[in-house]
Amino acid sequence: MRIKKYTKVRLLVNCCLLLFFLIDCGADRQSLYKDLLASLIYISDNKNIGSTNSDLTGSGSVSSSPADAAPENSILANSIPENMGIKILTHNVFLLPKTLPGWGNWGQNERAQRIVSSNYIQNQDVIVFDEAFDTDARKILLDGVRSEYPYQTDVIGRTKKGWDATLGLYRTDAFTNGGVVIVSKWPIEEKIQHVFKEKGCGADVFSNKGFAYVRIDKNGRKFHIIGTHVQAQDSGCANLGVVSRVNQFNEIRDFIDSKKIPKNEMVLIAGDLNVIKGSREYHQMLCILNVNNPKYVGVPFTWDTKTNEIAAFYYKKVEPAYLDYIFVSKSHFQPPIWQNLAYDPISAKTWTAKGYTSDEFSDHYPVYGFIYADSSTPTKSGRKRKYDRVSFVSVATGKKIQANSEKSNAWLKVNATTETDLTKFNLVQTNDPDSNPSCMKSGHVRIESSHSLNYFWNWWLGGGKGNYAYYPKFNDGSNRIQIINLDGGCLQDGSRVAFKDYDTISRRQYFLTVWEGGNWDKYLYLWRSHIGLREIFYLKLDSSPEMNWSKKLIYR
């Protein structure tokens, strides 16, 4: 009798959703939702209509099947021929113009080279790159992937040459192009660039943002892809640019409608859509674009200030967000399932720009879109490094070194009794280009707070009794600190280590010690000329497993 029990609730939900669609979508969009509302009447008991952003991640509850219960263009699971499936990747690669004031050189050329040689871009049918603004870096990227993806568009908004058509409001006086490029393994039969008539607000007004449209032929099957990067959530915009994004989404939808694409051909929209997953704006976006809610798997965010060093550099206090998507148009060919997988790879080799060393490809993580997972689909996080999130336990006191929970650059103290994010630190030997070495030995090391990325161990010399005490300093670690493995060989779990640094005043090296007594008891100091118990620490490697979503993927 459960059906009777929930009948009134479902009726109320459907009425509310109907009102929401009528308000949000406008009269010209209302007809698009008849099938959706009909399907909601028969929604199963375990459907989670009200999932939040975090609930949606990897759950598959509302996204394990297309939004329509029986879409007109759907087909049965496991009945898709290979040429009817497609694997598409979108990645905002953060290749800003090197001349951009306030941003400058973020290793654009080096990162483009790392992307070219990476594994994460392999085995796709189509890739949409966003923020490929910089001319030199973009050339490195496109030339480098050409052997696998020989069919390519130019970046949108740079020139009208080479396109079958240029639509929208193309501006010759724009400071920079639109940053979007599409590359394909399969022949591109048609390519159109559309520069948004809604040119946006804030910093976006200086670029020719819009979208690239391509029609590709994969073994006789036509696919239509729109790659885009819409208005950023800019503090210089009213309501963080919501109105501009709505107008730009409408331009995308109107373009799709104008193309009169056959209903049995698949239409995809991919890129950095700058809308937070699970928000009210997110559902409005799905409505305007007339796309299905995908099944989400992978990491919970595509722009993560807690795990990505570049994202954290400028926006440490901003919460992580899921902003990048690959959607399927509901008015066209419907696969039995559509999955979006957010992945967090790191470069196998580090890069250095203006003294800053990192292994990040970008400030965003890539997203894969596909019908069924296969052997090449990532099944776990790419961020499990041996010498990340290590902790140090004092041999003398049994307490752990920890950062401060309230202030990223407050003093380091050796007083933690339990393991937390504050007791975790990332080790990098910047002279070793291997981003994930299996064997780190004694030598110079950069020690970063796992809790506050880009804050590195340094010692204070600004007066007072705090002189020579250690604290995490933003983007400025001691470049002479060394880790000494007292047991010799590779650093392992349980290795006894000491730290040695150089005093620029006395021009002598000293060992770091746990201060004993007085107001500075348990603080970490550069002080001792010899090693005793208070200078020795046990190294503890992180034993927690990497995030694994293999059981949430759907395979053929």
From Swiss-Prot:
Which Gene Ontology cellular component annotation is one that this UniProt entry carries?
extracellular region
**Example of a GO MF term:** sphingomyelin phosphodiesterase activity
Q: Catalytic activity annotated for this protein?
A: a sphingomyelin + H2O = phosphocholine + an N-acylsphing-4-enine + H(+)
Cleaved signal peptide residues: 1-27
The record's listing under Gene3D superfamilies reads: Endonuclease/exonuclease/phosphatase
Keyword Hydrolase carried by entry: yes
A family per Pfam? Exo_endo_phos
What is the annotated localization of this protein?
Answer: Secreted
Entry keyword annotation includes Hydrolase:
yes
Listed A to Z, the keywords are: Hydrolase, Secreted, Signal
What protein is this chain from?
A: Sphingomyelinase C
What species does this protein belong to?
A: Leptospira interrogans
